Amino acid sequence: MELTDADLLARVIVDGDQHAFGELVRRHQSPVRGLLRQLVRADLELADDLAQETFIRAYKNIRSFRGEAKFSTWLYRIAYNVFRENARKRKELVGIDEERLQAEVDPQTPDPGLRHDLMNALANLPLHERTAVTLCCQNGLSHDEAARVLDIPLGTVKTNVLRGREKLKKMLAAWAT
């Protein structure tokens, strides 16, 4: 029987079980890296570095997890904060080097060209819309969970997702012609 995130968290907090934390990292590493890749526009090395920093901070601050939201929501919040701090240091919060955009080809995606176009379109969205769309549409967070991660009002998240999706549709339609 596989342990839940809550069970693993209890083992980490109560017993200091590093293997339990390793399992949490294994479970959540891919979604966290995916979010960070979208935020840094597919710079794989930077996304990996930020993901590592995210998990280091999560481990150091695990006792501050109050359980008011899912563990993944708490982790996404840490990842977003790590991204913002890095961007501030690099003075790139608004514009990140476009030439770094790389297409990820998912072997399970029937049309790799479509995935490439979607990643390019996502990269062209403003950061606030790209982040909201990535959290809600790609990572499956509810609007409420995304609002907690981003520390913005629920209505703002809904607006950012709606506008981002509309812009994506327009960009993809324009590229198809």
Regions found by a protein language model. Give the residues of each.
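Short, Lys/Arg-enriched C-terminal cap helix and immediately downstream tail that follows
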Residues: 88, 165-177
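Short helix-capping/turn signature of helix-turn-helix
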Residues: 27-30, 38-40, 134-141, 151
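Helix-turn-helix DNA-binding module
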Residues: 120-131, 139-156, 167
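Arg/Lys-rich amphipathic alpha helix in sigma70-family domain 2
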Residues: 60-67, 77-97, 163
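Internal acidic/polar
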Residues: 2-7, 85, 91-115, 120
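Structural recognition of an alpha-helix C-terminal capping motif at a helix-to-coil junction
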Residues: 49-56, 69-81
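Sigma70-family region 2
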Residues: 13-14, 40-42, 53-70, 89-91, ...
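Short, charged helix-capping/linker segments at alpha-helix termini
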Residues: 13-23, 34-53, 176-177
